[in-house]
Curated annotation (Swiss-Prot):
Mg(2+) 1 binds at D303, E317. The lineage of its organism: Bacteria, Pseudomonadati, Chlorobiota, Chlorobiia, Chlorobiales. Pathway: Cell wall biogenesis; peptidoglycan biosynthesis. This is D-alanine--D-alanine ligase. Its EC number is 6.3.2.4. It comes from Chlorobium luteolum (strain DSM 273 / BCRC 81028 / 2530).
Amino acid sequence: MHHTTVALLFGGRSLEHEISVISARAVAANIDRDRYRVLAVYITRDGGWYAGGVAEQILKLDIADLIRTTSLEATAATLREMVAASAEPPFNFDFRGIDVAFPVLHGSYGEDGRVQGLLETLQVPCTGCGVLASALTMDKALTKLAAADAGLAVAVSVTVMSHAYRRDPEATHRLAVASLSFPMFVKPVSLGSSVGITKVNSESELAEAITHACSLDSKVLIEQAVKGREVEVAVIGNDTLEASPCGEIEPGSEFYDYEDKYIHDTAKLFIPARIPGDLQEKVREAALCAYRALGCRGMSRVDFFVDETTGSIVFNEINTIPGFTPVSMYPRLMAAAGTGFMELTDRLIRLAMEPEAGASA
């Protein structure tokens, strides 16, 4: 029996490196080995690609537990030491033997169209979105513009380039205070997992938050805080789409930040979301609208703020490679829709191998 070879890409150069490893471990455990041959491909923080060998060893590590019991820095050091000890050369595999790639690369250099473009050039089908949708949705500011153009409500915001802020920080402070009211959120535009996001409650906190975000990204979004529940929808499909039931996150801290997600595990998840049924249907319709407007394929998780007292639905962001960790919403939402984890990976691989309408041979 022929087994389709799936290259599971994980790690990567972004600040979400360790989260990618946790996601990949869950994906690897839920791919049907009777149907697929999995080739683990680990990408180091400095861009080295390693297949098999040390990549397989890293997948066996319980990275989530390592982060909780030691630290993020110690975990990163462990991964570096494992690669060095293996003495394997990077780029030790041939793309020609791969039938489909399954990138579980969160953040820059993985979720932003770069890897998707490489795979497309090599004519290797890839799970999830293509180059354009991946690049567009990686930029929170551009995503909001596209969502608003599609008729979705978005939070009021201002965008600043990091170099412009360093040149004249006071101009940015004046613009933010004149355009928005407190509380605000300051966000690097291209990072996920809530990395670098700060909630700002007063003008005295603004400079530190923007400086921090500018140290992580070339562009920063300063956004009006939105009242409402954090509601998420999983979407799957290419031409024919399916939206999951709505899920809700109740943060364990002021907002659903990196530590709340992956270290303290204090957030509460509710499926279905605690909003009326008719409002849930409107959120699901809005998720499908965003998915289509942004040109998504394969999968995405679409996030909103929902106020059940006013019926307000505000688009927040879309994740084209959502988390697949044990605490991640995307696989949980798909399970609530009747698609278990192993069936989910199978569907995503099959969707990747469908030809895109209008694509040249």
